[in-house]
């Protein structure tokens, strides 16, 4: 793992705020695809998760993955920042069926032997790793018919600081469709989720099946 990459994400982690104890519906666990609280679709994007093995690329504090595990999934969450694993373990380590590891996505997938039914990335590794590098590895660790889903900002919705443009892999819906089909996925669906009132940046949500 690149120490520079880990250090960069550690700095980001230091600025992140813990998720609220309950959401607007009074739930103590939930999955959120967007950058806004109580906004956008829920885990039903993934289909039924009970009995399925889930991998989250960029699991952060583990809240989204833990929610899926409460619904009957088993899950592995990886994050490149060591402090994120520590936070996730502290909050969710007592939940049966969930595991958190410190790892960079490409390195983890290259060494993995497990097969996953669901892979998700919410503003995570899919956005920050070249698709031609990452997607063959993701597909290689997925069961036939498995679900890949990920979200990030739509292309061009945020101006990047000088020197950081290459850190994010922004693609249009058509580009994502072509990339995913080319790397062994089918039934690619791209949704553009409008932001809440008074906000300007929406969310792009992509779902595909391992063919």
Where in this protein do the model-derived segments appear?
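A short, aliphatic-rich alpha-helical micro-motif
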Residues: 48-49, 113, 135
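A short SAM/SAH-binding and catalytic strip from SAM-dependent methyltransferases
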Residues: 118-132
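Conserved class I S-adenosyl-L-methionine
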Residues: 1-50, 63, 147-175
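Class I SAM-dependent methyltransferase SAM/SAH-binding core
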Residues: 55, 60-108
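A short acidic, Gly/Pro-enriched loop at the edge of an enzyme's catalytic core
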Residues: 110-119
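Core SAM-dependent methyltransferase catalytic element
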Residues: 186, 192-211
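A short glycine-rich, Lys/Arg-flanked "PGG" loop and its adjoining helix->strand segment in the class I
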Residues: 132-147
